[in-house]
């Protein structure tokens, strides 16, 4: 492949692709294509094929040149990565050799004011990765005060969530909250940040974004799907950027790699054989040089595992947190 003039360097890219260990003739899934950084590294490492998925139509359109460069080895599909098993089947790949995922919002999305992901720019309060379904403005306009507080607390880990929700409800009774600046200003009045701390609206924006895009449910389902499509010795590499995501990945891999070891004083309970073997006990984190070049890498954690020959475990139940459908239905 020809090198591109403008290359996107993904966080922990070489490390993630190193865990995948791509081989010639292998089929790999990039569940979160974004700007194509992981996909490009896989294509350059070996004569392999990549099926890349992204729910954002802008990402798919932006990958057209890379599709041409790849000469038939890259297929781009606009879809949610929770559907990766169906996507692979539609591409004639019942099983694959590796899956990589980079969880959360991309730098590209954060830098586009019109997407409404960041309070750094004033733009429409949107936050949708796929451009469909309710926007953040819709949630802010229609969710009850209790639901708003729960969303901001659970998904944003904001301890002042009730104060923020109360302020949002009071403000929207006066005028619709439709821009990122309007929401950030409302939050800043009730969440006081000390010098050197993150912007007071950071956690509220995170909570709304995760909720609007159903990111944690998507992650749960994507991990289950990856387990089903990976062939024996196939590898999974997941990069996460905050504790909510990493906790889900860590728990999933711990459960799937568990090898029994129950108490000898208790009755033996049937337990599914491990479907994964961990590639490292601790997450891989970015080095000082990468963090200096890309501050977003500071919070990144990479976890990897190799598929065993054992059958996939039954998909777990989703946690009982607020759902987009239920909140919007109640807010009518």
Curated annotation (Swiss-Prot):
The keyword rRNA processing applies. One of its GO terms (molecular function) is rRNA (cytosine-N4-)-methyltransferase activity. One of its GO terms (cellular component) is cytoplasm. One of its GO terms (biological process) is rRNA base methylation. Its main location: cytoplasm. Keywords: Cytoplasm, Methyltransferase, rRNA processing, S-adenosyl-L-methionine, Transferase. Gene3D superfamilies: Putative methyltransferase TM0872, insert domain, Vaccinia Virus protein VP39. It holds the Pfam family Methyltransf_5. S-adenosyl-L-methionine binds at residues 36-38, 54, 81, 102, 109. It is found in: Cytoplasm. It catalyses: cytidine(1402) in 16S rRNA + S-adenosyl-L-methionine = N(4)-methylcytidine(1402) in 16S rRNA + S-adenosyl-L-homocysteine + H(+). SUPFAM superfamilies: Putative methyltransferase TM0872, insert domain, S-adenosyl-L-methionine-dependent methyltransferases. Its EC number is 2.1.1.199. It comes from the Bacteria. Signal peptide: none annotated. InterPro entries: RsmH, SAM-dep_MeTrfase_MraW_recog, SAM-dependent_MTases_sf. Residues 295-322 are annotated as: Disordered. Coiled coil: none annotated. Specifically methylates the N4 position of cytidine in position 1402 (C1402) of 16S rRNA. PANTHER family: 12S RRNA N4-METHYLCYTIDINE METHYLTRANSFERASE, S-ADENOSYL-METHYLTRANSFERASE MRAW. Belongs to the methyltransferase superfamily. RsmH family. This is Ribosomal RNA small subunit methyltransferase H. The gene is rsmH.
């Amino acid at each position: 492949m020809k090198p591109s003039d403008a290359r996107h360097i993904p966080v922990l890219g070489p490390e993630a692709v190193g865990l995948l260990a791509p081989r010639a003739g292998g089929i790999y899934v990039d569940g979160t294509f974004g700007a194509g950084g992981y996909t490009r590294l896989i294509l350059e490492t070996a004569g392999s094929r990549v099926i890349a998925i992204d729910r954002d139509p802008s990402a798919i359109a932006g990958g057209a040149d890379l599709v041409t460069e790849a000469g038939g080895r890259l297929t781009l599909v606009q879809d949610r990565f929770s559907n990766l098993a169906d996507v692979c089947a539609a591409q004639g790949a019942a099983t694959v050799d590796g899956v990589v995922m980079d969880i959360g919002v991309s730098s590209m999305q954060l830098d586009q004011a019109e997407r409404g992901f960041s309070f750094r720019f004033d733009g429409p309060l949107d936050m949708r990765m796929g451009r469909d379904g309710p926007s953040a403005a819709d949630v802010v306009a229609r969710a009850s005060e209790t639901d708003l507080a729960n969303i901001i607390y659970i998904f944003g880990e904001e301890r002042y969530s009730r104060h923020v929700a109360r302020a949002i409800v009071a403000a929207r009774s006066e005028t619709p909250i439709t821009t990122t600046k309007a929401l950030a200003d409302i939050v800043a009045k009730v969440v006081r940040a000390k010098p050197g701390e993150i912007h007071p609206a950071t956690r509220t924006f995170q909570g709304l974004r995760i909720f609007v895009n159903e990111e944690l449910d998507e992650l749960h389902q994507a991990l289950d799907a990856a387990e089903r499509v990976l062939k024996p010795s196939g590898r999974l590499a997941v990069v996460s950027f905050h504790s909510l995501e990493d906790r889900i990945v860590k728990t999933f891999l711990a459960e799937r790699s568990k090898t029994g070891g129950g108490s000898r004083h208790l009755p033996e309970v049937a337990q599914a054989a491990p479907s994964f073997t961990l590639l490292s006990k601790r997450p891989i984190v970015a080095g000082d040089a990468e963090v200096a070049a890309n501050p977003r890498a500071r919070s990144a954690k990479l976890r990897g595992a190799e598929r065993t020959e054992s059958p996939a475990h039954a998909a777990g139940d989703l946690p009982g947190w607020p759902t987009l459908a239920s909140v919007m239905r109640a807010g009518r």
